[in-house]
From Swiss-Prot:
The keyword Zinc does not apply. This is Protein archease. One of its GO terms (biological process) is tRNA splicing, via endonucleolytic cleavage and ligation. Belongs to the archease family. The lineage of its organism: Archaea, Thermoproteota, Thermoprotei, Sulfolobales, Sulfolobaceae. It comes from Sulfurisphaera tokodaii (strain DSM 16993 / JCM 10545 / NBRC 100140 / 7).
Length: 139
């Protein structure tokens, strides 16, 4: 199963992330967002950042997860390539970890900066044996 794919969206970037379970789909969504910004295969997991959030539904958890990671990019110029997510669906909480390193122009390709997460076209689908997360990021 592929981890993610991009889809056409006027002036923004649409992402479909896949996972065998909800945690893996959220992890792959994060990889996709950072793949928009750089080649994540060149981002070494040198430093770890933690994210602990709650939400009012799964879509809000997805929004807040990606938003939290973008805050690290905006404040510390951190790029991430490896993620761990544990979602408590009953209590709508997410505990996550992201590993990466600070942007280095000599090492990391500069692609399109993701400015923000959006709710536009957001959808979380449980297909039984896998999940599909669809969302759009503002560039």
């Amino acid at each position: 199963m592929q981890k993610f794919e991009f889809f056409e969206h006027t002036a923004d970037i649409g992402i479909r992330a896949y996972g065998r379970n909800l945690n893996e789909a959220f992890e792959n969504a994060a990889v996709a967002v950072f793949e928009v910004m750089t080649d994540t295969s060149k981002v070494e997991p040198k430093e770890m950042r933690e994210v602990k959030i709650d939400g009012y539904d799964l879509e809000n958890l997805l929004y807040r997860w990606i938003e939290s990671l973008l805050v690290y990019y905006d404040s510390e110029i951190m790029l991430f390539s490896k993620f761990y997510v544990n979602i408590d669906e009953k209590n709508l909480t997410l505990e996550g970890k992201a590993w990466g390193e600070k942007f280095d122009p000599n090492k990391h390709e500069r692609r399109t900066v993701v400015k923000a997460m959006t709710y536009h076209e957001m959808k979380i689908e449980n297909k039984g044996n896998y999940y599909i997360l669809t969302f759009v990021v503002d560039i």
